[in-house]
Amino acid sequence: MAAEVHPTAVVHPGTVLGDGVRVLEHAVVGKQPTLSPRSTAKREPLAPAVVGAGTVISTGAIVFAGSTLGARVIVGDQACVRERVSVADDVVIGRGALVENDTTIGARTRIQADAYVTAYSTLEE
C-alpha cells in the first residue's frame, strides 16, 4: 500500500516513506535544520528522514532530516522530532511533544502530550 501524503503536507526530497505511511495536513517530514551562526552543532547536511511502514505523522507535526521512525509509530498533532532521532516500532509521541536531537526511543514507548525529551536521551521500552 502506497504512502498517503495530504496536499498541504511537505515531504522534503530524499525522504523515505514506507508502505501505508500517512502524512496529514500541514505536517513536514525530512526538513534540514537551520542553525544559528553561533551554533556549535554539526553543520553537514543530514541523511534523509526514514519513516517506517504504517506510521502516521499527524497534523502540523515536524520530523527533521536524519531521523528514523520505525513501523506503526504515531507522531501526534504539532509534535516535533528533531534531527538524528531513532524511534523504534509501535511508539506513540503525543500531541505537542518535543523530542530533541540525538535521542533514542525504544519499542512500544509512550511519550505523553506536551512532553519534552532532552537531547542525547535514551528512553527504553
Language model features with spans:
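Left-handed beta-helix
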Residues: 6-7, 12-13, 18-19, 24-25, ...
